[in-house]
Structures are given as C-alpha cells and as structure tokens.
Amino acid sequence: RSSDLNDEFREYLSEFARSDEYKEMLVQHTVHMICNSGGNVGIERISQELVYSPRYVERVFKEYTGFSPKKMCRLVRAHKALLMLLCSKEFSKTMISLECGYADLSHMNRELKSVLGVTPKMVGREDLYLGSMKTSQTVYNF
C-alpha cells in the first residue's frame, strides 16, 4: 500500500515538474536569484539551488523570456553600475566597477557600451536620456 502511494506521489511530482506552472516558478526563482545577486550569479549556482541541470534551466528560462540567464545577469549588472554612476558621487568609477562585479574599469566600460549603449563618460550628460537610453528600453522589454 505505501509503495502505491509512493508511486502515485512520484507520478504527481513528475507531472508537476513538466507543467507550465512549475516552469514559471523556475523562471521566477531564477530572476529572483539574478536580481538579488546584482547579476553576479552563475548558471551553475542557479541550477544547484533548483536541482536541475544548467542546460535545462537555460532552456526553460529562454523559452519564457526570450534570452538566456547570462544575458539577464549582464543586464542587471550593467543597470546596477549605471544607477551607481548616476547616484553615487562618493565612489570612483573603479570602485563602482569592482562593487558591481566587474574585473576592472575597462571591463565595466565595455559591458555598459555593449549592453546599454552608454559609456561612463556619457552618464550625467543630458543627451544620455534623449538618445542613448532609448535603446535600453527595448532591452528591458520582458
């Protein structure tokens, strides 16, 4: 009798794990982990916590969002760096780059340009909001 219950429970869990509801929860948890880490979490860590293979997590995430967890990490980290550059006059650009998880200032500069289309030199300039930041709106359309 208990083996029948175990079999039924396993079947239920197996079906639930394939359901859209479960996949949505997986994506929400992945987004939560990425945002809470400031974009500094790898797919290995995410998949360990979710107890699924990195490939499965990437596939489900991309199916629901249209891009990879790594791309979201890059977006979140670049956005954090941009906000710190805009709001924090007490830290140097090098300090901000390290705080955001970049290897160095040039790494942050390349990522900001690649991901958001801006450079640290552009931050604070009026045309940042009139031109370049318009392109970042399409990036956050998820």
Where would I find each of the regions flagged by the language model?
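Short, Lys/Arg-enriched anionic-surface-contact patches
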Residues: 13-26, 32, 68-76
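Basic, amphipathic alpha-helical hairpins
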Residues: 13-19, 31-42, 83-91
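Basic/polar phosphate-binding segments, predominantly the helix-turn-helix DNA-binding elements
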Residues: 44-72, 97-119
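Basic, Lys/Arg-enriched C-terminal extension of HTH/homeodomain DNA-binding domains
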Residues: 78-80, 96
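…primarily DNA-binding HTH/wHTH and HhH modules…
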Residues: 86, 111-142
